[in-house]
Every structure is written in structure tokens, then in C-alpha cells.
Amino acid sequence: AAEALHPLHGVSATFSVVIADPKTGICGAAVASKYPAVGKVVAYARPGVGAFCTQHWHNPKWGEHALDLLERGHQPEAVLGILLKDDPRRDKRQLAIINLKGRAANRNPANADPAGHYWGAMSGRFYACQGNTLTGREVIVAMAKACEETKGSVADRLMAALVAADCAGGDHRGRLAAGIRVCKPDVKGYWLEMHVDKSDDAVIDLLKKYNAANHPAKGQWKPGHRPFQHPCPNRPKPKAPNPR
């Protein structure tokens, strides 16, 4: 019983996004957090299947397992139900999943740690975004808005969502790590994978790597035009929301 009070793998307080494009079959996930190397333990995707994120009290063993269940034909909501059914830490989990039809599902931590405030999630047409330990609800709203309004590829939209969340305040503890993973049906493994494992400004550093990359996962940009110049370079340092 005592063990159930503690995370098995870590507390990855964070914000993340999953996106799928049914027309191209491209899918992916992106994440940022104060947790080191967060992109390697929270965000998962698989060609021809979909994308998944496990966070707050994350369980990296669920990454491939969730995608296995999705590949076997389970709907996203059912996958999350299977994962959580016998999990003694289910009230601490925050999960998101999407299949290649664009059907998404979220679960929020019903008993989040006090430091996990603010937490929340939103989903829409072909995306889901979620977060905990945020500066406020505006972080989730900003991610959703970026997913809805950004023109370009799946990778572009994932990056835009991270940048929007960062501008809105992001993780109230800081900006240590970020990552993006994108899959394409005819490419084994990750088509695009970038990580910043430790940094003073991880989203900005990931953005710089993305801007500098010559990769077909990125949208068609006009010569000399980089669409993700950070719109809020002078944003204030993150801080926890006022207690309710």
C-alpha cells in the first residue's frame, strides 16, 4: 500500500501535444518540461498507428504498450481504460492518445499533486493537448489555438503548439527540456526526432534546431522565411499560479 503512494518512474510535470493527419498518415507528439530529457519518456508515436503521451506520474513502459493496443484496433478511449484499469496510480496519471483517423482521448490526474496545479486538457480536430504544473489555463488554450490555426505540416503544428504554450507561461518551474517525434507511414521508426535534454530555455533551443534543420517533415517555407521566430522573447519567468 505504501508503494502506491509513490511514482514508479518519475513525476514528469509538463505540457504536451499529439497530432495526426488522416490524409497523409503522419502523426507525432511534442513535449516540454522542467523534467530532464522529457521527450524520451513522455512522447511516443508509431508509423501507421498514432501517438501517445504519458505524464505527471509518467510510466514510460506504457509508451509502446499503448501503441500496441492502438495497432490492434482498440479505440483511443479504450486504450486509456485498459492502461488505467488495474493501475494503483491511475488518479495521478495524465494521458493523451490519438489514432490515424484523428480520434483523440485524454485523461487528467483526478488526484494531482498540489504542485501539479494548474492542470488541464483540450482536444479538437485531429489533436489533443494537455499539461500540468502550468502557470495557468491560458497555456492549454494557447496550445489548442495553435493546433487549430497553424498552417503547415504536422511537425510545424507540433512546434507551434510548444511555442504557444511557452509564450503563455508553460511549466511554472522552468524550461529545462523539450522534444518532438514525428512518424510517416513509409518510414520505419521516427521520421523526425529532436530533443533538448537540458537547457535554460529548452523550447527556444528546440525551436532553433528545428528552424536550422533541412527535413521534409517541415512545411513548405518560402525562401528566407522561418515561421517560428519566437513571438515573446522577453516573456517573464514562469511562476506558480496563486493558490485557490
Feature map (PLM): residue ranges:
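N-terminal nucleophile
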Residues: 3-244
